[in-house]
Design a protein with these regions (language model features):
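Conserved catalytic or regulatory cores that recognize and/or transform ribose-phosphate-containing ligands
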Residues: 1-98
Length: 98
């Protein structure tokens, strides 16, 4: 199973984001076993001119490969996460719960 992780990132540092992701990945592996594949949606090297729409387009592209999506804490506060959730709902991508 390929899982996309949707996570609020605005105003957070990379270390905090990575720590939360690692905890989620561990929980997913405990639930689904080692066969779970995590789609890495954390963009580390942003182009200079990248804006929010560009980032969202990359997230949607990655989400298109997913069998399921996990929405992390406070997802509803982030516009991008809300859009990703709407896409899951509209296109039948399973919303994974831990």
């Amino acid at each position: 199973m390929k899982i996309f992780i949707s996570q609020p990132m605005k105003g957070r540092d990379a270390e905090e984001i990575q720590k939360e992701r690692e905890e989620a990945i561990l929980a997913l592996k405990n639930k689904y076993g080692e066969g779970v594949e995590i789609i890495d949606s954390f963009v580390k090297d942003l182009p200079k001119d990248a804006n929010a729409v560009w980032l969202l387009s990359k997230s949607i592209e990655l989400l298109s490969y997913a069998d399921g999506a996990l929405f992390l804490r406070n997802w509803y506060e982030a516009r991008g996460c809300r859009i990703e959730r709407w896409i899951c709902h509209e296109y039948g991508i399973e919303m994974v719960k831990l």
